């Protein structure tokens, strides 16, 4: 949902939009909670409170102040990510298709011939890093830029088996126009940028597990971050390959040679970062014009020095000349070298050309060896061709996508590799590598071992759920890693499947109860965003491709109502109850009936079950930003930090009742996952709360009324307001609590409206209006370790007779309290109080 805050109402009516006017009788937290549970996507928030907007944004719900009508029109028609700290709106708006254009934030693409293959009459537009060049389009009171691009489709095309780009991009645009927006993917770059800047400033050592190409720009300015990936393809790994011949295959209609060069250099750069944790000088020989340098410089102040007879406009220092092996002495330590020398074929015959290429390959290799033979802190990437070669067994092979698969590949070496054992590799084996292997990632660092790191902050986004990891080892890492942000795939199945297929892999699935964490926040993507100064207009959908975000070591853990809080917890329930169900009271009715409470009068205002916990369980797929386990734990230890709001603390027994209702719901829905989740949450409640039951009571609290509107034959009709199992020495403690609650007890609006047979020969009158105070009293006794209440649900009633009687129904009648007392069962009254 998105909340657009206005000082005045608007005349125009928008689809899927609801107006909420700030309620001055409620505080900012209560207003935020009410807004978050509205069911439309767009909320126009009138007479708004800035504090309420802050609360919503911290909860991951985008809430933006609107000053002008064009701001409202722009934000209401598309989704966006909001940096509420810097007041920047990142639109995810593809309406630019109506200008017959596709967009990119990678400058090198604009220098290709891609426009020859676009839809007729269409053009390509460069919009800058995260759409920064579009800021001039929006003259708004907040900073605004459109981060939507078609780079995802362009890159997917490059790695696909499709050659016809026009058909491919047409298909992708049609898909985008007919499917739900992949909002997490669109906002992810904004999130990653913010995340790692924050972590690097707060932690001396940061480890990142499983980065992919979409992060290749994110880490350019963070050389200190240790990366773990799937490892490199080494020269020695070619021993598994059979010999093949030249294949020759076109991968792309437009020229992607620059993309290949950029990937080669970035792969080399991240190898250098992995070894030396600082920024090097980047030397490049050949590969002009290297327009992609412009892209790199949008993210980092890396320095480039280049040699090529052709211009390289974005190099910091360009030598418009050839580079010879004697020039290696000009190259300094603390650097990387990219050797991409290859003479143009022009009109040469194949044999002459092949001879020159092989000579240049040897020359390239010699330049690399010479460069690595002296000095320190050096890594080299060199262009090679398929030919009989001796190569260091530990050197890394690269074959990033290029326009045509021919005979070229690349080799990365560091100083140690260049001096390592060399192995003869036949030309046919290298052709086999070229024909069958595409390097899919610029991060080729070693795989991560699932072991706790003592001094590091571990980030593992979408990296650990794969079933080649041991599931128990993943759980141990989450439980024991002190500082971390780790995601795992949430179990969205209805049959409690332990793993699910996704694309061409299988992932383990998890529930929050799989983890034993007492100082970690377990939330959703949008809940996590709120903790890093971001919010989002479109919450995650229960697609099956959803992840739990687990933050360990965060200073926000105790701020229960500020982050990963209960905002939107009733939203799915409202959507169902007010559109599909038998009555809008269906949730209240079901919760009472499933706990054998058949008095449904006033069930919507006096419910005996925690609606928060019930909704968090049965609708967990729709809203798991609320960290239910943390909420339970912090209340059980009395450590919850509550900033504001009319905050009701549930008695632990109310939580148990909610689990029982959720379990019944799961059985009716044949939802095995919710069934397990409910059982495990109930077990967790019993673990963190020391709940004892007065199933063998020796004292009870009684309430005698001045008026009973029914006939009765018992001596003193009364409401048993709970039973206790206490020693005689604890009586003063019980009395002290009753005195503390005196005012609230006598203020109860107690009513009755019918009689019924509670069981054989027990004739009773119903009592309404007491449950809320009962549970507050329960909490007070619990905190003093006084056993109060039974394991079965408390059903308030007044016993009228121990014989069968006819049921009577009357108009709701108020019962006036005469006095309240504490009495020993089959004994004397030890305390009483009147108003």
Curated annotation (Swiss-Prot):
Location of the region described as 2'-O-methyltransferase activity in the Swiss-Prot/TrEMBL record: 246-428
GO biological process: symbiont-mediated suppression of host innate immune response; viral process
InterPro entries linked: VP3_Rotav
Pfam family, one: Rotavirus_VP3
Sequence similarity: Belongs to the rotavirus VP3 family.
Domain notes: Contains a bipartite N7-methyltransferase domain, a 2'-O-methyltransferase domain and a GTase/RTPase domain. The C-terminus contains a phosphodiesterase domain that degrades the 5'-triphosphorylated, 2'-5' linked adenylate oligomers produced by the host cell in response to IFN stimulation.
Gene Ontology cellular-component annotations: viral nucleocapsid
Keyword terms: GTP-binding, Host-virus interaction, Hydrolase, Inhibition of host innate immune response by virus, Methyltransferase, mRNA capping, mRNA processing, Multifunctional enzyme, Nucleotide-binding, Nucleotidyltransferase, RNA-binding, S-adenosyl-L-methionine, Transferase, Viral immunoevasion, Virion
Region annotated GTase/RTPase activity, chain positions: 556-692
Record-linked PROSITE patterns: SAM_MT56_VP3
Main location: virion
Documented EC number(s): 3.1.4.-, 2.7.7.50, 2.1.1.56
Function: Multifunctional enzyme involved in mRNA capping. Catalyzes the formation of the 5' cap structure on the viral plus-strand transcripts. Specifically binds to GTP and displays guanylyltransferase and methyltransferase activities. Has affinity for ssRNA but not for dsRNA. Capping activity is non-specific and caps RNAs that initiate with either a G or an A residue. Together with VP1 polymerase, forms a VP1-VP3 complex positioned near the channels situated at each of the five-fold vertices of the core. Counteracts the host innate immune response thanks to its phosphodiesterase that degrades the 5'-triphosphorylated, 2'-5' linked adenylate oligomers produced by the host cell IFN-inducible 2',5'-oligoadenylate synthetase (OAS). The host RNaseL is therefore not activated.
Annotated organism of origin: Rotavirus A (isolate RVA/Human/United Kingdom/A64/1987/G10P11[14]) (RV-A)
Protein name as annotated: Protein VP3
Top-level division of the source organism's lineage: Viruses
Region (2'-5'-phosphodiesterase activity): 693-835
Active site location: 718, 720, 797, 799
Subunit text: Interacts with VP1. Interacts with VP2.
Residues covered by region (N7-methyltransferase activity): 171-245, 429-555
Reaction equations catalysed: a 5'-end diphospho-ribonucleoside in mRNA + GTP + H(+) = a 5'-end (5'-triphosphoguanosine)-ribonucleoside in mRNA + diphosphate; a 5'-end (5'-triphosphoguanosine)-ribonucleoside in mRNA + S-adenosyl-L-methionine = a 5'-end (N(7)-methyl 5'-triphosphoguanosine)-ribonucleoside in mRNA + S-adenosyl-L-homocysteine; 5'-triphosphoadenylyl-(2'->5')-adenylyl-(2'->5')-adenosine + 2 H2O = 2 AMP + ATP + 2 H(+)
């Amino acid at each position: 949902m998105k909340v657009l805050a206005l000082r005045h109402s608007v005349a125009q009516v928008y689809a899927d939009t609801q107006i909420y006017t700030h309620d001055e009788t409620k505080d900012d937290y209560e207003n935020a909670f009410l807004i978050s549970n509205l069911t439309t996507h767009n909320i126009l928030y009138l007479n708004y409170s800035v504090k309420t907007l802050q609360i919503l944004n911290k909860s991951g719900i985008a809430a933006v102040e609107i000053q002008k009508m064009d701001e409202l029109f722009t934000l209401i028609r598309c989704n966006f990510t909001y940096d509420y700290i810097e007041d920047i709106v990142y639109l995810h708006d593809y309406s630019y298709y109506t200008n017959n254009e596709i967009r990119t934030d990678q400058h090198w693409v604009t220098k290709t011939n891609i426009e020859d293959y676009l839809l007729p009459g269409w053009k390509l537009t460069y919009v800058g890093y995260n759409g920064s060049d579009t800021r001039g389009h929006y003259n708004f009171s907040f900073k605004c830029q459109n981060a939507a691009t078609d780079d995802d489709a362009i890159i997917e095309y490059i790695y696909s088996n499709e050659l016809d780009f026009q058909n491919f991009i047409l298909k992708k645009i049609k898909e985008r126009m007919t499917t739900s927006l992949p909002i997490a993917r669109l906002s992810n770059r904004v999130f990653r940028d913010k995340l790692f800047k924050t972590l690097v400033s707060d932690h001396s050592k940061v480890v990142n597990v499983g980065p992919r190409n979409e992060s290749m720009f994110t880490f350019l300015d963070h050389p200190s971050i240790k990366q773990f990936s799937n490892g490199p393809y080494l020269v020695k790994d070619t021993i598994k390959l059979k010999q093949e011949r030249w294949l020759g295959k076109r991968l792309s209609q437009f020229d992607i040679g620059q993309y290949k060069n950029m990937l080669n250099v970035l792969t080399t750069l991240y190898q250098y970062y992995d070894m030396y944790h600082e920024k090097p000088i980047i030397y490049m020989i050949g590969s002009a014009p290297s327009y992609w340098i412009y892209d790199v410089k949008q993210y980092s102040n890396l320095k480039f020095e280049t040699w090529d007879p052709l211009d390289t406009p974005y190099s910091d220092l360009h030598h418009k000349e050839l580079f010879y092996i004697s020039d290696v002495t000009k190259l300094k330590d603390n650097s990387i070298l990219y050797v991409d020398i290859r003479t143009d074929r022009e009109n040469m015959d194949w044999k002459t050309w092949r001879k020159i290429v092989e000579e240049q390959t040897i020359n390239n290799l010699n330049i690399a060896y010479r460069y690595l033979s002296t000095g320190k802190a050096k890594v080299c990437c060199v262009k090679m061709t398929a030919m009989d070669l001796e190569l260091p067994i530990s050197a890394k092979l690269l074959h990033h996508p290029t326009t045509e698969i021919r005979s070229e590949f690349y080799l990365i070496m560091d100083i140690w590799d260049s001096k390592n054992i060399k192995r003869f590799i036949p030309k046919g084996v290298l052709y086999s590598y070229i024909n069958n292997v595409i390097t899919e990632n610029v991060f080729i660092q070693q795989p991560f071992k699932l072991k706790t790191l003592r001094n590091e902050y571990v980030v593992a986004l979408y990296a650990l759920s794969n079933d080649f990891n041991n599931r128990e080892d993943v759980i141990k890492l989450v439980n024991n890693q002190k500082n971390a942000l780790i995601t795992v795939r949430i179990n969205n199945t209805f049959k409690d499947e332990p793993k699910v297929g996704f694309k061409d892999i299988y992932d383990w699935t998890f529930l929050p109860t799989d983890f034993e964490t007492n100082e970690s926040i377990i939330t959703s993507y949008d809940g996590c965003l709120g903790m890093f100064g971001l919010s989002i207009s479109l919450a995650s959908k229960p697609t099956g491709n959803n992840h739990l975000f687990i933050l360990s070591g965060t200073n926000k853990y105790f701020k229960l109502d500020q982050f990963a809080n209960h905002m939107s917890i009733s939203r799915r329930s409202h959507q169902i109850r007010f559109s599909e169900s038998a009555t809008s009271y269906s949730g209240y009715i079901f919760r009472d009936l499933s706990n054998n409470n058949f008095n449904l009068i006033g069930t919507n205002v006096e419910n005996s079950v925690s609606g928060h916990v019930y909704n968090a369980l049965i609708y967990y797929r729709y809203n798991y930003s609320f960290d239910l386990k943390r909420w339970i734990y912090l209340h059980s230890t009395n450590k919850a930090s509550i900033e504001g709001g009319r905050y009701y603390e549930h008695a632990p027994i109310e939580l148990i009742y909610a689990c029982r209702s959720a379990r019944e719901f799961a059985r009716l829905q044949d939802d095995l996952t919710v069934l397990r989740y409910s059982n495990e949450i109930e077990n967790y409640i019993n673990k963190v709360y020391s709940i004892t039951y007065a199933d063998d009571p020796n004292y009870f609290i009684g309430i005698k009324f001045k008026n009973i509107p029914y006939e009765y034959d018992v001596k003193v009709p009364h409401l048993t307001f709970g039973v206790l199992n206490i020693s005689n020495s604890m009586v003063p403690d019980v009395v002290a609590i009753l005195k503390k609650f005196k005012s609230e007890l006598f203020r109860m609006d107690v009513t009755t409206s019918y009689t019924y047979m509670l069981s054989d020969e027990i004739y009773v009158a119903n009592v309404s209006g007491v449950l809320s105070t009962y549970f507050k009293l329960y909490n007070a006794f619990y905190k003093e370790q006084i056993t109060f209440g039974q394991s079965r649900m408390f059903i308030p009633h007044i016993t009228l007779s121990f014989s069968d009687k006819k049921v009577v129904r009357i108009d709701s009648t108020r019962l006036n309290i005469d006095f309240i007392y504490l009495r020993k069962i089959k004994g004397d009254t030890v305390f009483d109080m009147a108003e």
